[in-house]
Amino acid sequence: MHDIEYIRQNSEEFEKAMESRGMKEFSAEEILKVDHKKRLLTTKLQDLNRQRNEITKKIKELKMSKSPCEKQIKSSKNITNEIEAISLKEQMEKDKLVNILSNLPNIPVQGVPIGAGENSNLEVRRYREKRQFDFVPKSHYELGERLGLMDFEQAAKISGSRFAILKGQLAKLGRALINFMLEMHVNEFGYTEVYHPVLVKNEAMYNVGQLPKFSDDSYLTTDELRLIPTGEVVLTNSVADKIVEEKKLPIRFTAYSECFRKEAGSAGQSTRGMIRQHQFGKVELVSITTEDQSNDELERMTGVAEEILKRLELPYRVILLCSGDMGFAAQKTYDIEVWLPEQNRYREISSCSNCGNFQARRMNAKYSLEANKKVKKYVHTLNGSALAIGRTIIAVMENYQNPDGSITIPNVLQKYISNGTVISK
């Protein structure tokens, strides 16, 4: 949610920011008109309430002196009726303003490349040389099906398209990755592990910017609960409607979450197998910070996600997203892309974003200053995948495959799989 005062004072700058987010020929005029109308009604209400209070005081004085007060009582009733009518109009304008602002994305911070799509993204760094194969590398789905450990056909019979069943050593590999990631985040980087619901209210989705704009992308149950598209929804909402002491920030949470999205993706090689699923597992990171901490926290969070790939010895690159390619709530985002040999390209495996106070305004999350506890400011929120489990499985399978179709288990994971070293038939 945007600060209306900022829009009043910086309408042209705000328009440019929205245009950089892909809203062509955006104008702040409608926002300012609705805001002006609402403010006039608010001023009128304040004046009427003042008049009614004065009349009420006068009525009390007249009654105490046993003087006639019918005229004042009638006047008070008329003002009350007028207040009720104007209050309804004011609420309508408030709702209209909130609806407009709720559908507008966050403003990019300085340093974010301005552009419409991925061609304007900026590569920041790379890690590790790509493995040179002396055979033609196979895809993860070909490897998995040949091993008899990955079943898309039966999953489709049970649940439809875009689902997968993993069995045996591949299922263990997924569990090993979850344990490895969570233990690293908790034991080495100070995150608090959270076990949380996967069904949430619409309000929780609204707070993080998933609603109203992306309503059709999530699964809605018959009792108006939604399956989470990311663990960020629950972890970020942990501070909704709260005031946190500044000295307790930053707060860092991590959780393994089953996530659900309706996206079907486009047909073709890039979406075959487990690349884009309706249900997928993800280890999430969320940080709640002061406004002064969030920039450094984004760098730290991205570094934590990178550390997983470094320990798995997987080639990757870090991309700074341009203004038109960022998520709705983000003001700055780094994507981490892992190398997939069979596809001969990098694919996203993590996205780490600083949302500033955008989500905090929607969910009314603040912190009290240590120097003056009466002063409250909106917290800053950050979120990142560290990492998407399915895509990490894919990356391990494709980068660690052997000529016979077996898969070498990365050293760092072997202790989680009974010291196994190879996945084979």
Curated annotation (Swiss-Prot):
One GO molecular-function entry: ATP binding
Listed GO biological process terms: selenocysteine biosynthetic process; seryl-tRNA aminoacylation
GO cellular component, one term: cytoplasm
Catalytic activity: tRNA(Ser) + L-serine + ATP = L-seryl-tRNA(Ser) + AMP + diphosphate + H(+); tRNA(Sec) + L-serine + ATP = L-seryl-tRNA(Sec) + AMP + diphosphate + H(+)
Keywords: Aminoacyl-tRNA synthetase, ATP-binding, Cytoplasm, Ligase, Nucleotide-binding, Protein biosynthesis
Gene3D superfamilies, A to Z: Bira Bifunctional Protein, Domain 2, Serine-tRNA synthetase, tRNA binding domain
Keyword Signal on entry: no
Amino-acid positions noted as binding ATP in the UniProt annotation, renumbered to this chain: 261-263, 348-351
InterPro entries, alphabetized: aa-tRNA-synt_IIb, aa-tRNA-synth_II, aa-tRNA-synth_II/BPL/LPL, Ser-tRNA-ligase_type_1, Ser-tRNA-synth_1_N, SerRS_1_N_sf, SerRS_core, tRNA-bd_arm
Broad class of enzyme this protein falls into: ligase
Pathway: Aminoacyl-tRNA biosynthesis; selenocysteinyl-tRNA(Sec) biosynthesis; L-seryl-tRNA(Sec) from L-serine and tRNA(Sec): step 1/1
Annotated positions binding L-serine: 230-232, 284, 385
The keyword ATP-binding belongs to this UniProt entry's keyword annotation: yes
Record-listed E.C. numbers: 6.1.1.11
Subcellular localization, as worded in the UniProt entry: Cytoplasm
Main location: cytoplasm
Function statement: Catalyzes the attachment of serine to tRNA(Ser). Is also able to aminoacylate tRNA(Sec) with serine, to form the misacylated tRNA L-seryl-tRNA(Sec), which will be further converted into selenocysteinyl-tRNA(Sec).
Assembly and binders: Homodimer. The tRNA molecule binds across the dimer.
Family: Belongs to the class-II aminoacyl-tRNA synthetase family. Type-1 seryl-tRNA synthetase subfamily.
Domain notes for this protein: Consists of two distinct domains, a catalytic core and a N-terminal extension that is involved in tRNA binding.
UniProt protein name: Serine--tRNA ligase
Organism, scientific name: Wolbachia sp. subsp. Brugia malayi (strain TRS)
Gene from which the chain derives: serS
